[in-house]
Amino acid sequence: ILMLTLVTENRTPLLGILKGDQIEKTPIGQKAAEEIQKIPTYDGAKSIEIYSYIVMPDHIHILLRIHEKLPIHIGNYIRWFKKQCTDNCRALGVPTTRLFALEYHDRILKGKHQLEHMAKYINDNPRRLALKRQNKELFTLQQDILLNNIPCTTMGNMFLAEYPIKQVIQCSRRLTQEQIDELKAQCLAQAQEGTIHITAAISEGEKQIARALREAEYPIIVLLQEGFPKPDSPHYRYYKPAGVYFEACAKGKLLLVEPHAEVLERSEIITRTEAKIGKIPHDTQRYRFVAMNVVAEMMAGGERES
């Protein structure tokens, strides 16, 4: 199974218009949909089956099921598809050098679970686009935000950072499942009383507790390390969190925070990190993980109790 993503040149929305939570295809988008159906005929052997696809205003997703070894490289199918779409675009009176950008993204899916998950994801694209447009302030990357004097890039509900009662989720990797479950119950009880939790979600225990809070729809602040595209990246403008983080963000229940790279080298953070684990190289995973939890403590306004 192969998932293909193609975007229009300069992300120009020529393929469709969002109406409610559905995409109304333009004539160009309708022609692109028709060309998608023709992809299995390109090699004459019908080695490819179209499992699912979606046409969005400025991009398309296609799920291909490949039944046997292709007689030609998949790139040849894509080039042929893009050429046909560009020809159709010109025939409709829209002058363009090319409809789709030169690059494309492909991803191999393994197993029925990945296939079903990705099919659900691409079919849900219009609804998620509607949510993003309805909640622009929640899906805008904000640069150089200071949280407790820590410079960050953020996305989500900034009001969560201003709430006075915040608690860090921090779990040692040595905790047993029983201990994790006990801490999870404590965090859920705190959240019910109004506490906002902060976590880097690094250890298994931290991930489990963050998941439980999210599933219960309690607000949460999640620290990321190199989680956002850079401002000069072509993906910066179009970034949105994936999966469950997207849903939480749309509901105003999530704040994603990426401390600037130099933050982990601040003297105060180095001192507090080394007090926990001793002096180790700063480029190690261990140092970065513990330092991120120190940053979470500082954003919460102190150190985690217990």
Model region roles, listed by residue range:
Residues I1-Q142, L146-I150:
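Short catalytic/metal-binding and nucleic-acid-binding patches
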Residues L141-S306:
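Glycine-biased, small-residue-rich flexible motifs in mid-sequence functional cores and linkers
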